[in-house]
């Protein structure tokens, strides 16, 4: 049975202060804003359990944050050593990392290439669209992130561009798409920033106070309306389709999965089958959560839930 594990080696720590970042805001309100940097001991214990469970099946490791590269190069070099040591069944291993790209240099690229990483690089388009992604000192990060992308192209590292689909990006999707094409970016993922419904899990309305706590008013300046999103989908799909018909295909993950669904194939994107994929999320201190979003809330820490309930609420199923 394939096993998918997301590790947060730097917890919520990040060198950027993106204006729309929900994770930075919510993590600041939890009892423990950061779970600290992941130790070699925690990494080793996690990988041992993963390889023991997987046997000869695939182990998929995804590193996210915060900014996972803050864990340092030695951490990822040690990762490679531990995999070689513990993967006694020679199970196939996939490694992914999601980064803002500002720390990427040539040595990082060599690490990515050597480990066969798939890198997700956050870049919201051209310099105008990327103005919401600033560092801790309020400085723009566009040129640093773009330089990281260029270095990965130089070293032949596989990477996707991850775009937070704000209102500003959606309204300028044509020039932004042309910018990505000009940079020869072949794989794009758009992550919609939509206002959440004012209802709880049972469908009952939630109070304005609770809504505002979960969704700060400043972020409403960047979130799309349903109309914004609809217009984006139409414009972007038209460009995607034209490029496909002209033999100039650029992968856009959401549309690729729409095509898979139209062909009665299973989508690979989380949530497109009507439910979240089964995944373990390991925080910097080794706490385990059932999903990435749940890791922002102390209540979902496995130490607070009886093991019998954990097993019932997050059943494992074969990964097709």
Question: What is the predicted role of each segment?
Answer:
Residues 1-110, 114-116:
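Conserved alpha-helical substructure of the radical SAM core
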Residues 7, 27-32, 61-65, 131-134, ...:
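Glycine- and acidic
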Residues 16-20, 30, 127-131, 197-202, ...:
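Short acidic/His/Gly/Ser-rich catalytic and metal-binding motifs that mark active-site loops
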Residues 52, 70-189, 196-203:
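Conserved AdoMet/S-adenosylmethionine-binding subsite of the radical SAM
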Residues 134-143, 150, 155-275, 281, ...:
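Radical SAM enzyme [4Fe-4S]-AdoMet core and its adjacent flexible, acidic
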Residues 296-320:
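Membrane-interface junctions of multi-pass transporters
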């Amino acid at each position: 049975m394939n096993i998918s594990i997301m590790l947060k080696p730097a917890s919520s720590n990040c060198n950027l202060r993106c204006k729309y970042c929900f994770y930075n805001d919510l993590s600041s309100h939890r009892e423990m804003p950061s779970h600290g940097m992941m130790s070699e001991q925690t990494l080793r214990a996690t990988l041992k359990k993963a390889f023991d469970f997987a046997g000869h099946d695939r182990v998929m490791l995804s590193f996210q944050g915060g900014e996972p590269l803050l864990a340092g190069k030695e951490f990822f070099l040690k990762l490679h050593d531990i995999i070689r040591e513990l993967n006694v069944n020679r199970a196939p291993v996939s490694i992914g990392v999601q980064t803002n790209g500002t720390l990427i240099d040539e040595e990082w690229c060599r690490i990515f290439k050597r480990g066969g990483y798939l890198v997700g690089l956050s870049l919201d388009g051209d310099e105008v669209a990327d103005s919401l992604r600033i560092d801790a000192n309020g400085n723009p990060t566009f040129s640093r992130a773009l330089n990281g992308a260029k270095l990965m192209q130089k070293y032949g590292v596989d990477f996707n561009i991850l775009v937070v689909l704000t209102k500003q990006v959606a309204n300028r999707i044509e020039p932004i798409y042309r910018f990505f094409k000009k940079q020869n970016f072949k794989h794009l993922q758009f992550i919609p920033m939509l206002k959440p419904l004012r209802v709880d899990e049972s469908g009952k309305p939630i109070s304005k106070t609770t809504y505002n706590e979960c969704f700060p008013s400043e972020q409403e300046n960047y979130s799309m309306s349903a109309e914004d999103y609809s217009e984006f989908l139409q414009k972007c799909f038209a460009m995607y389709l034209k490029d496909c018909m002209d033999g100039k295909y650029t992968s856009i993950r959401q549309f690729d999965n729409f095509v898979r669904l139209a062909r009665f194939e299973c989508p690979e994107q989380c949530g497109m089958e009507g439910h979240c994929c089964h995944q373990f999320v390991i925080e910097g201190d080794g706490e385990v959560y059932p999903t990435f979003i749940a890791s922002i809330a102390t209540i979902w820490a496995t130490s607070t839930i009886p093991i019998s309930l954990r097993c019932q609420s997050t059943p494992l199923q074969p990964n097709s």
